[in-house]
């Protein structure tokens, strides 16, 4: 991670165990900010440990959350007695997340929260609780409306696919929903959730189920939590 202003602290959360590999890669780099990596379901409350408990429940492994709950107590400065083993953790971690973060980044994951409205709102509640006033949320995902329109115009109305110059598949998107309209109106929020697509990316080598993101609706719901879209000069 490089930027003009040094990063003072990084909290990295992912529901998958791949976060442990990311932690190792970070540890092996020479320029690394103070960091904490955790396996956590960010569609559940982060601060109170629900996200950790959800992972423990899903993977049937209590050890996944025991250490992480202690780390949460430390970084959110909850006045709890910590085990002796934690005494060597640098003091700068204590309470470092209590006042929130300047930037929250969600790369190629926003679409998963559009499974249903409760899942999305639970995630946005995490953003609201952890982003400082004046801070930024940055996210990356497909434009759901563009994907919807391209699937409508596809020869079989169901599949989009791109191949490279050697005929190897680069990506594919397969429609799994039945909806014929993805237009946002404030009265039809419920109908825009759960619009499933199967996505294959050659760089990952697997197919994952994702959900179309209607940006108009997303912006509207984010505004309820005091987030406003910002156009940055690049």
Where are these regions (language model features)?
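Class I SAM-dependent methyltransferase SAM/SAH-binding core
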Residues: 3-87
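Local beta-strand N-terminus motif with an aromatic residue
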Residues: 100-102
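SAM-dependent methyltransferase
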Residues: 140, 144-225, 230-234
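Short mixed-charge
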Residues: 56-92, 158-186
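A conserved beta-strand element that flanks and buttresses the S-adenosyl-L-methionine
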Residues: 105
